[in-house]
Structure formats: structure tokens, C-alpha cells
């Protein structure tokens, strides 16, 4: 038993093929694992991962165990492996290395890899590593109080004129408001003519009415309309009446008549000794929101719509009267038959008349369409103006 025991004690221990050196991953830099000494070198075996992810230690540091081959090399290698009959690629690689041993020995020898040297190199690199620099943004110093105040005042002066954008001026704002809220008003235009100084309580009476007038006296309780009287000395007189000048000036017919009124027969008028007058009765403008049915129901039927808007009048018998003849709204309600003096001839243009001597007599502008006759005690019989307009 003793020899056996001695043999057991003296028997050499089997050669250690592997020496495991537990190193941390931060020390060797080969990844999270342990360094295992194998025949011919060392490997870095990954902890908690498969063996194929481990690395081998070479003269130039740890490298992957798996070798990636190019496509032509992989084809040739697998062809050798198949011809050798090996089932693993590593066996084919060992055969190739053995056959090329003489050529490999002729190569220069490389120093073996020492893990201690690698650890010292990594420690020195970590100690010499410089701290990373970070950029710090330094804010500029705040301006002085005086500079801040001047800067703020300058900005207020620059922005004072541009409080509203250029497109938002007063005109555009007014147009925008009118587009959303239309205002039905006829007194929005302003003219340089003086306003009416008469009473405006009878503006409602100046509605659609067309009536001729004769030599009948006007009613004393009514005011005078606008009167233009043309004389032989080519003078023009104006008298404002109850109707406002703005409302009468808005009518397009009034603008046409105003352009047509011109007296160029001064010499002929002096020789004939006659006097022509132009009477302008300024009716109030109808409100645009009144419909035609409302107007007819309020004011009664119209006498005539065929009566020309312009009529010439000329009466040589009134030469002894004053040159300024007035006409009132009550005078328009008198239903005198419209009479054309013998010395007046109507031209082809309605509303223009000439005297027998060929002189221009003048224009007769009707005051308004007849309405509100019952207020003045007039009857409702139709006027002769409509029949006279069809001559």
C-alpha cells in the first residue's frame, strides 16, 4: 500500500492546459469577461455570453475568434475543408498551418502577449487622459440703467408711428366695417356748397311729383324752393329752400342739368327785351331702402312717368314783374293746365323750348312728383302735365 501511496503522492500532476486569471473588464479592456490562459496564448472569455463572442489575445491585442473571410477566400477554404473531409472549419485551418509550417517558421518572430503589460498600458492611458472640456456660455453684462432707458425710449419712438400696420389705416378700417355693416344713408357726401338755411320740416312733402305751374300766386304758408333767374344782363340769382343742397346735388339728373345751364344769348335777349327764368326745385332724395310698393302705397299713384324732366318756360307778359320768380311746393299742387306761350316752340329734344325769334328760352325743371295733395286741400284729379308731355 505504501508504494501505491507513494506513487500516488509522487505522481506528477497532469499538465495544466488552462490557467484562468479572473480580471475585471475595466482592467484589460477586452470586454466584460475573464482572461483564460490556453495552449499557445490567452483568450478573453465573455461573462454571461456565448463562447463564440470571446476574444483571443494576440501580439496586437485581443481579437475576435471568428474570422470573416471574403467571398472568394471562403469558397476556396470550404472547398479544401470538403476535400479533406473535415466537419469543422478549425480542423481545416490546422491542416493548412501544419502544411505551411516551414514557411511560417521563416517569418519573423513576434513577442508574445503579456496581460500585465497590457494592464499597465491601460492604466497609464487612463491616468494621462485629459478631462473633457465643456463650453460655458457667458452672458454679456447687463447695460447701464441710462443706456437701457435711452434704448427703450428710442424703440417707443420707432414703434409709435407703426402701432398699426400700413394696411390698417383709417380708410381701410372704415371700408371693412361698411362691408360687414352696410349703412343705408343718403347723406354721406359732403360738398363745398353752403347748406340749406330754410326749415327742413317739409322735406317729406318733396316726393315724387311732377306738376306744371302757371301764374297763380303761391301759398303764403310755404317756403320758396331754389330759384335761378336768368336775365338779359346774364346775371344768375340763387335762393336756397327747404330741401337740403346735399340731397338735391346727389341726383344724377341735377348734375346733367347743371352742366346744360349756360346762357350765351346775351345780345339776343337784350334786343328782344325778354326775360327767361330757370326754377330748380330741390326734392329730397328718396331713401334707398324704400321699395316701389311702399312708395306707391304711401304717396299715392304717380300722375305720369312720361313727362319730360326738363321743360322750358317763357312768358313775355311777366317782364314787368321782378326777375326772380319763386315757386313753392303748394304752387306745384295747383292743377292749372300746362300752357305753352305762343312765342315758344318745343324742339325735338324734350324739355327744351325756343322762342319765335329762334332764341333759347331756357329749361324748366320740375320740382317733384306730386304727392301729399290732401294736406293742402287739393283734389286728386290727374294733372294736365302728363297729357301735355305726350304732345
From Swiss-Prot:
Source taxon at top rank: Eukaryota
Pfam families: TCP
Keywords assigned by UniProt, alphabetized: Developmental protein, DNA-binding, Nucleus, Transcription, Transcription regulation
Location in or out of the cell: Nucleus
One GO CC term on file: nucleus
Chain ranges of the TCP domain: 49-107
An annotated Gene Ontology molecular function: DNA-binding transcription factor activity
Bias type Polar residues, positions: 381-391
Tissues of expression: Expressed in cotyledons, particularly in the vascular region, in leaves, roots, buds, flowers and immature siliques.
GO BP: any one term: leaf senescence
Region described as Disordered: 1-34, 122-168, 317-345, 363-391
Quaternary structure note: Interacts with SPL. Interacts with KIN10; KIN11 and FLZ3.
UniProt function note: Plays a pivotal role in the control of morphogenesis of shoot organs by negatively regulating the expression of boundary-specific genes such as CUC genes, probably through the induction of miRNA (e.g. miR164). Participates in ovule development.
Protein's name according to its UniProt entry: Transcription factor TCP3
Native organism: Arabidopsis thaliana
Lineage start: Eukaryota, Viridiplantae, Streptophyta, Embryophyta, Tracheophyta
